[in-house]
Amino acid sequence: LFTTILFHQQIKKMSKLKLFIISANMLLVLLFFGFNIVKNEKVLSEGETVLLELRPVDPRSLMQGDYMTLHYEVCNHIYGLEAESNKFCVVRLDDDRVAHFVSLTNDATVALREDELLLRYSLEKSRWGGKFYTIGSDSYFFQEGTAIKYVTATYGMLKVVTKGEMIGTCSLVGLCDENKKLIE
């Protein structure tokens, strides 16, 4: 109650211009976050499902209790080519929707076969001075105490935008076991 009274007294002391500027900034922040939420929800609802094979997981991240560092096998090919950042990786999907590396491209309009997709990747700096490539998310957060379920994760399930200006954008849905079933 006391803080509410102080808050109202501070608002009364503010000029109308200051109040407008603060309100406009708050509105811009809310619009920014709202736009990003809508964009990510669109990727999840309209994106095409792809499974990316995971490289062996760093066990230290499991010991922290609530997240797992993800490294996708497809990124091994990008490392080998010393690729630029924020470009596209062409992958071919097998019958189980598992992605296999084909090539790299700078062109979002490149002609693709029916079973191929573009995945947007980015080059990130490591905390230890190195670099790594990411596709979608590079970590998976889960409820504390449930780490044992995710030790057997073999694939990351992602949704990928296949057309428009966001082509190749990926959102992580969850992790799958060796049978390609989503771990819940």
Indicate where each model-derived feature is located.
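Extracytoplasmic
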Residues: 47-49, 67-69, 84-88, 153-155
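Generic structural detector for well-ordered beta-strands
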Residues: 51-53, 92, 159
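Structured domain cores in non-transmembrane regions
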Residues: 75-118
